[in-house]
């Protein structure tokens, strides 16, 4: 998509106070128009606020909006927490991670801005993030929008989680149908 399809990215981290929703569209039929392609999955980009210079009232409102949004999303297939690899994880980062754990969904943490770190700085920075958030080995995933590092891996994780969730929901629906049929029989 073009510029109108993207969220505005500012120089101030966490300044966005809106939930941005995206429909990731599957492949269109051969010779079909983009309008004929069916949504594959939905992505919700929740506002960040860890390092923003927001007023306490604004920060509280952003937190409340994010909590309300997440609280209604029982079909969530994956939680992704993006943190700046150059910073020690904040209490806000830990709170978001805890909220995702409470929702009992798979979680991946992406360490962003890795392109701004030297080879010598990267290892210690990732260890700081890992320890600060209590992450298992293999996380965080290095991600850079500048170099593209980790973006294909992140998309694979997203698509795998969506596919798994669809299979779970299909099995649940079959189970409900089978029990309804047994009750009616």
Predicted regions mapped to residue ranges:
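Conserved G1/Walker A P-loop phosphate-binding module
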Residues: 1-53, 57, 163-164, 168, ...
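Conserved NTP-handling cores and scaffolds of large molecular machines
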Residues: 3-4, 41, 70-73, 83, ...
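Conserved nucleotide-binding/hydrolysis micro-motifs of P-loop NTPases
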Residues: 15, 48-50, 86-89, 113-118, ...
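Amphipathic alpha-helical transducer elements in NTP-driven molecular machines
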Residues: 16, 59-63, 90, 94, ...
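Residue-level signal for inorganic ion chemistry
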Residues: 22, 112, 154
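Short, solvent-exposed loop/turn segments at secondary-structure boundaries
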Residues: 54-58, 119-122
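Conserved C-terminal guanine-recognition region of P-loop GTPase G domains, centered on the G4
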Residues: 63-139
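Canonical P-loop GTPase G-domain recognition
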Residues: 116-173
């Amino acid at each position: 998509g073009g510029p109108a399809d993207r969220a505005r990215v500012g120089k101030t981290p966490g300044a966005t106070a809106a939930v941005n929703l995206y429909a990731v569209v599957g492949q269109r039929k051969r010779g079909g128009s983009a309008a004929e392609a069916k949504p594959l999955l939905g992505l919700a980009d929740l506002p960040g606020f860890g390092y923003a210079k927001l007023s306490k009232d604004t920060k509280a409102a952003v937190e409340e909006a994010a909590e309300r949004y997440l609280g209604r999303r029982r079909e969530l297939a994956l939680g992704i927490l993006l943190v700046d690899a150059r910073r020690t994880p904040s209490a806000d980062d830990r709170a978001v991670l805890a909220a995702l754990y409470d929702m009992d969904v798979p979680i991946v943490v992406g360490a962003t801005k890795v392109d701004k770190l030297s080879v010598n700085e990267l290892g210690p920075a990732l260890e700081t993030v890992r320890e600060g958030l209590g992450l298992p080995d293999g996380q965080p995933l290095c991600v850079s929008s500048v170099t593209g590092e980790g973006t294909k891996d992140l998309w694979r994780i997203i698509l795998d989680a969506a596919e798994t969730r669809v299979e779970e929901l299909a099995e649940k629906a079959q189970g409900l149908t089978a029990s309804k049929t047994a009750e009616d029989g």
